[in-house]
Swiss-Prot record:
CDD domains: Ribosomal_S8e_like (cd11380). This is Small ribosomal subunit protein eS8z. Keywords: Ribonucleoprotein, Ribosomal protein. GO terms for cellular component: chloroplast; cytosolic ribosome; cytosolic small ribosomal subunit; nucleolus; plant-type cell wall; plasmodesma. PANTHER family: 40S RIBOSOMAL PROTEIN S8. GO terms for molecular function: mRNA binding; structural constituent of ribosome. Gene3D superfamilies: 3.10.290.70, Ribosomal protein S8e, subdomain. The keyword Ribosomal protein applies. GO terms for biological process: translation. Residues 8-26 have a biased composition (Basic residues). It comes from the Eukaryota. Residues 1-37, 125-147 are annotated as: Disordered.
């Protein structure tokens, strides 16, 4: 039978059935949704569409390019989990990647960039007095084993110092770096272009989705 986007198979406004007066047409054809799943076994299909054009139907993905707007940088990173979808909870349960889905991405590539750009290591946990003593003993052993740090040139040090002047970081994002997972939104259409690209959530948008996710967790616990 196939999925048809015509109106010939629909009833009339009065409720009566219409007689099929012509065969189906190729241009009225519909295709089933991609329902791109989160999986390390990347699978993307090439689909020939009207006009001889091509669509890329992603069936399984686990990586994408995510931009950090306030820092004007983009990094390829792993998608770890789907945590929220405004339209459908079923898509969260089945870990389906669609446009505007809220996902958790790996923070490591951004952490690495931040260290090289600002000379600041993000996500380091604050140590208590008891743990510092233990770390002191372990640190001595590690210092012997660890390779020497690459010496930075004076020019690079000046450049990092000038960047430090205008540096500011949202406290919510800093907390996320400590956990190693950043909340992001998918802005591409995986079922159409075969990619799950997006942007890191910040500011008011981040606060909004954090509240939504927290509310959902509260309902689940009840």
């Amino acid at each position: 039978m196939g999925i048809s986007r015509d109106s010939i198979h629909k009833r009339r406004a009065t409720g009566g059935k219409q007689k099929q007066w012509r065969k189906k047409r190729k241009y009225e054809m519909g295709r089933q949704p991609a329902n791109t799943k989160l999986s390390s076994n990347k699978t993307v299909r090439r689909i020939r569409v009207r006009g001889g054009n091509v669509k890329w139907r992603a069936l399984r993905l686990d990586t994408g390019n995510y931009s950090w707007g306030s820092e004007a940088t983009t990094r390829k990173t792993r998608v770890l989990d789907v945590v929220y979808n405004a339209s459908n909870n079923e898509l969260v349960r089945t870990k389906t990647l669609v446009k505007s889905a809220i996902v958790q991405v790996d923070a490591a590539p951004f952490k690495q960039w931040y260290l090289s750009h600002y000379g600041v290591e993000l996500g380091r946990k604050k140590k208590s007095a008891s743990s510092t003593k233990k770390d002191g003993e372990e640190g001595e052993e590690a210092a012997v084993a660890a390779p020497e740090e690459v010496k930075k040139s004076n020019h690079l040090l000046r450049k990092i110092a000038s960047r430090q002047e205008g540096r500011s970081l949202d406290s919510h994002i800093e907390d996320q770096f400590a956990s190693g997972r950043l909340l992001a939104c998918i802005s591409s259409r995986p079922g159409q272009c075969g990619r799950a690209d997006g942007y890191i959530l910040e500011g008011k948008e981040l606060e909004f989705y954090m509240k939504k996710i927290q509310k959902k967790k509260g309902k689940g616990a009840a």
